[in-house]
Structure formats: structure tokens, C-alpha cells
Amino acid sequence: MTLDTLIDSGKRFLLFGGKGGVGKTSCAAAASVWAASRGYDVLAISTDPAHSLGVIFEQKIGSEVKAIKGVKNLSGLEIDPKVAYRQLQGELSKKSTEDLSSFGIESISDLDMGSPPGADEALAFAKVLEYIEKPDHDLIIFDTAPTGHTLRLLSLPDVLNSWLGKMIKLRYTMGRIWGGLKSLVGRDTDERDESGKALEKLKATVEKARVELSNKDRTSFVPVMIPEAMAVEQTEMLLTALYEFEIPVSNMIVNMILPQEVSCKFCESRKAMQDRHLKEIRRLYSDQFRLTELPLLDSEVRGIDQIIHLTKFLFEK
């Protein structure tokens, strides 16, 4: 069963995820190229700190949206959590720092409550939110980080919401104190706390993202796995989290399957192991999801030609 119906289903967000090394970036890249070839305006976003997306497309992508060479209608973006973290910190603290400097406090961080759990991932998620809000692209395809990072990413709407609520309360409490101090030194007390407004805007965006990511008409998460014990285990963990966060799943990819006929003892042993796990995967998931089974290719997926070759298995066979 192929993924073609998923691409043409009218969804705006597709997320590919799974254990490290199972080929999720290759699948995300192939889905992006296939969708773009059908006339959709596509943005492929990597939230994986390793950023393999640029490696597969054989071009530098980076932290600004960039057209993918050789593919019409396709752009790429690699979100660097540390850069996103610094940018948002700067936006939230700039106005408060200006106010505090008059009283001998150099930075809002001197008075801050600290960062949310998984701060760098949280702020990378905040960067993702910008693109969830923008109507610039027909389809956004996410190449997510390995399972553990992705589970934290999926929990961030709740984490950020709680943290932002506390931060907003603190900012406005301190705003009243700053207002009193300003009046003592003759400064304008009517000026709004810009960092507080920025926090409120971010909180509203997080709420919107929660709604978008749980909307089955708009979003689908595609777990990618290989027929090995660890990958099966981590996929089950991922699915449990996806259900908990109400993120829709309709398709699943089983990658790197050996051919039926193998000709060496090592290959026979690996094939027997894969067959056991493949049987279990089909038993567990074939009634719940559309399973797409991909063969182990004879070369790595790098460059447009190899990506197009992979699309034939994902979408045509």
C-alpha cells in the first residue's frame, strides 16, 4: 500500500518520525519531492539537530527558507534549536531589559524564572509555530528528530503553555512594580510591557498549534520503522504518545526490508530475524494503519535522482 492518498488528502502538515537510522529523513524528502511534482507548494522542515535533510538533497539548507535545487515548488528549512532559542529569548527580553537598565539591572535573565524543560527544543518548536501560522505553503512536511526528542517535542504545547502562563503572570506582576519605580524617577508609567505582549502572542500561537496538530483533516504523523526489535519497541512508545497528544496517525512505513531470496548465511539469518518482526508488525498494525513496506535499496538515498527512485516505492508500487 502506498502513500499517494495521504499526499492528496488535503492535509497541510505531515510529520515523519521514528528511531534514529530507520530512514525517516529519506521518506520525508521523498514525500516532499512527490508532492511538489504534483503541483503542491511544499516546505520541508527538519527539526532534527543532526539535519540530514540538506545531506540528502546535497545542498546547504540552513535556518532560512531556501529553494531546493532541481525541484520546482519545493523549499527547505533546517531549524537550529540553539539559534531559535537565542532569537526568542532576545525578542522577549529586549523591552524588559531596556526598562530594567535604568535601575542597574543588566538583563531580564537576572530576574527570570528560568527556561521551560527542554528549553532548546521548546524554542525550536516556537520557530515551527511561525510556519504553522503562515499560509505560504500548501503542505509542510516535517522531518522530526529521533523518537526521544520527538516525544519531548510533542509534549511542548502543554509544557510551553504552563511555563508561558507563569511567565506572563510574573511579567505583569513585575510590570506593576516597574510602573511604581518609573513614577518615582519621573518616567512614563503608561508604557505597555512589550515582553508581556510577546509572551501572550506566543501563548496564543501555542494554543493554535495544539488545535492544528490534533486535527485529523489537517495533520498526520507517519511513523517510520525497520523490522527489528528496538525499532518496533520505540514505535509502540511513539504511538502511545501520539494517542496521548491526540495527533492523528493513518499510515506507517516499514523500511529496509531484505529481498525474499538471499544467498549468504549472514543474509539468511538477518532475513529470518526481519521476517519474525515483520509478521509481528503486520499482526499489530495492519488493521489500524495503512502499511507501506519498502525494500532495502542497493545504494544510499542522496541527491534528487535517488530521492525520485525512492518515491516509486513510496507512491507508485
What are these regions (language model features)?
Residues 1-8, 207-317:
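C-terminal lobe/tail of nucleotide-utilizing enzymes
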Residues 19:
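P-loop (Walker A) phosphate-binding loop of NTP-binding proteins
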Residues 13-16, 57, 103, 125, ...:
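Phenylalanine-focused residue identity feature
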Residues 1-14, 22, 27, 31-200, ...:
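Nucleotide-state-sensitive switch-loop elements of NTP-binding domains
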